[in-house]
Design a protein with these regions (language model features):
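Extracytoplasmic gate region of multi-pass secondary transporters
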Residues: 23-24, 241-285, 289
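Helix-to-loop junctions at the C-terminal end of transmembrane segments
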Residues: 55-67, 294-307, 403-404
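Conserved MFS/SLC helix-loop-helix module at the cytosolic interface between two early adjacent transmembrane helices
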Residues: 54-93
């Protein structure tokens, strides 16, 4: 039973990634068939992202009311219907219409699953589950390419992904009883917290509520059945939790730097390093390979390393990757092992940046119960998901403006600035949560895997 539910969660993370890169891979053909400019893909992406942000912000109240199992099942159903809608779209405006349920479903399932896994499973599973997302994001474009190469329309690619999503939806509805068994009577998931963390959470929640007035204000008691205990926290209440603002900001800057690297590293290679455009497009894939493989490794290392150590280690490797971009610009024409030296630096840089990014996202999510208590986890993770999409949407275009006016040579410097901002916010998060936990006298959750 436990193993089957975990298998369902792994499949759910693969399904999260499946449609994410479909639009980008199919759009060169889609925009011609739909008779719209190439730039219109940005409108579809923006609408999906805005709906995702909206549903992420509402995820806590929905999760408390319906539970993780139902939210996941209905959200995947919603995304499956939206993908079927994409496959039937014969105009750009139909795409915009179906982008709304796609974004709403994606945001809800992302926040719900991350909340559930953070409470119920070890850091190993959190990293491997996000590795599954990377596999799904890689499989999606491959399926679309397979369909297109055999002479079928892009709509058949979406149809095939929709069928896969429908199969997962069926399994999710079959598994609703398993999710329900693991939900606490108060609507807060308890279940399989690793290494006795459940007991620590209950004891610590009570102690915090009895020690300081500030803690009493911020806590939602796990052992009460009152309506107040079940009520979703307001955004203002969340921000009053020590370290919450820094946690949300850390997520914002992390997702901004990941999206900036993925979006602009190719342009930096082409326009600043004079690398062939086709080769540059292939090299960008190394960054995502580094993220996927890095999360697999992080799952192994999490048996010995705490989430904090994984995050700080990842940030260090990320900075190493960024630093390798600087000598790449100074090594034009030089050779090493039959390759241009600048290409060697770029390959190493992209791999290190991917490996560095790998543990940060899942480890921040997984450490949320430890830093803020299980009763606040759903609220924090919903806001983390929203800040992730806002960071991905807002700061990469800022570099586009800078590149237009000052050149793509600014790319490594911009990445350094975002990295420093992320590191500063994360260090502030550690400082404030550790100060708060000293007031509470003992840790909230054992962070051992």
């Amino acid at each position: 039973m436990f193993s089957f539910l975990l298998l369902i969660i792994y499949l759910s993370f693969i399904s999260l990634g499946l449609p994410d890169a479909l639009l980008g891979s199919a759009w060169p053909i889609m925009h011609e068939e739909l008779k719209v400019p190439l730039s219109y893909s940005g409108s579809v992406y923006m609408l999906i992202s805005c709906c995702t942000i909206l549903s992420s912000l509402k995820s806590e109240s929905l999760n408390r009311r319906f539970g993780t199992g139902k939210i996941t099942a209905f959200s995947v159903l919603l995304t499956a219907l939206a993908i079927f809608g994409f496959s039937m779209s014969r105009s750009f405006y139909m795409l915009l219409l179906f982008a709304i349920p796609y974004g709403l479903g994606a945001g809800s399932v992302d926040a719900a699953l991350n909340h559930y896994v953070a409470l119920h499973y070890s850091s190993r599973h959190m990293n491997w589950l996000h590795c599954m997302w990377g596999i799904g994001a890689s499989i999606g474009p491959y399926i679309m390419g397979f369909v297109l190469q055999r002479g079928f329309s892009w709509s058949k690619g979406y149809l095939l992904i929709g069928i896969l999503q429908s199969g997962l939806t069926f399994l999710l509805f079959l598994s609703l009883g398993l999710w329900k068994e693991k939900e606490d009577a108060n609507g807060l998931a308890k279940g399989e917290l690793h290494d006795g963390a459940e007991a620590h959470l209950e004891v610590e929640t009570k102690e915090r509520a009895e020690t300081t007035p500030e803690a009493k204000t911020n806590s939602l008691m796990m052992d009460t059945e009152s309506e107040e205990g079940k009520k979703a926290m307001s955004f203002r209440e969340i921000l009053r939790i020590p370290g919450a603002k820094e946690c949300i900001a850390s997520f914002f800057f992390y997702c901004a730097i990941e999206q900036t690297i993925g979006l602009w590293s190719g342009s930096f290679m082409v326009y600043s390093l004079r690398i062939d455009a086709k080769l540059a497009a292939s090299l960008v894939a190394l960054f995502y390979f580094g993220i996927t493989f890095g999360r697999f490794l992080a799952g192994i290392f999490s048996a010995k390393w705490k989430d904090e150590e994984l995050i700080l280690g990842g940030i260090s490797i990320l900075f190493l990757g960024i630093v390798l971009l600087f000598p790449a610009g100074l090594s034009s024409g030089k050779q090493l092992f039959g390759m241009e030296l600048r290409q060697v630096f770029v390959i190493l840089s992209l791999l290190f940046m991917g490996l560095g990014c790998a543990p940060i996202y899942p480890a921040i999510i997984h450490s949320t119960p430890y830093n803020f208590g299980a009763e606040n986890t759903s609220a924090l993770i919903g806001k983390q998901m929203a800040s992730a999409y806002i960071g991905s949407l807002s700061l990469p275009p800022v570099f586009g403006v800078l590149a237009k006016n000052f050149g793509t040579e600014l790319f490594p410097f911009y990445a350094v600035v975002l990295g420093i901002a992320m590191l500063y916010m994360y260090k502030q998060l550690l400082k404030k949560t550790k100060e708060a936990k000293r007031k509470w006298k003992k840790p909230i959750v054992s962070d051992e895997a």
